[in-house]
Amino acid sequence: MRTLKFLTVIFLLTISSNNLFGQGACACCTDNHTSFDFWVGDWIVFDTSGNKIGENRIEKLEGNCLINEHWTGLKGSTGCSYNYYEPSDSTWNQLWVDNQGSNLILKSRAESNKMILKSKFQKSPNGNLYTNRITWTLNTDGSVTQRWDIADENDQLLSVAFIGIYRKK
């Protein structure tokens, strides 16, 4: 009887420890968690005229719970972003930091073959509100277009800060 109780306790501890230490199913392999996977890979980035402007390595880390970006521009700019899905509010989130002292915090929801992330509204030097709206679109040829728009409080386009076309290395 004692042996049966002991074996039962060992069995339950084994199951519990597998769940506690991540040995069970992939927690971040849901459709929501993988909706930005089209961006994962090693890329050469071009401007709209076809000129190479940099390279970007996008990889999944932390048991597929984090997408990590490593940007290297031809003119010396570098930057990293951390991207993750937040189940509590069903949003994607990005934190971007670069070697020029800039940072962005973006948030929104994924669409089919597209990710549109926005910053909170900020005040320009002249006092007008604006937001950063960055869209990544999976193209039919497997490339990805990243477009960074500056929009006003009515979501109307003020300017385009960046357009990059990602092609796999």
Report each predicted region and the residues it spans.
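Bacterial Sec-dependent N-terminal signal peptides
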Residues: 1-25
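Hydrophobic small-molecule pocket/channel-lining residues, especially in calycin-type beta-barrels
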Residues: 22-169
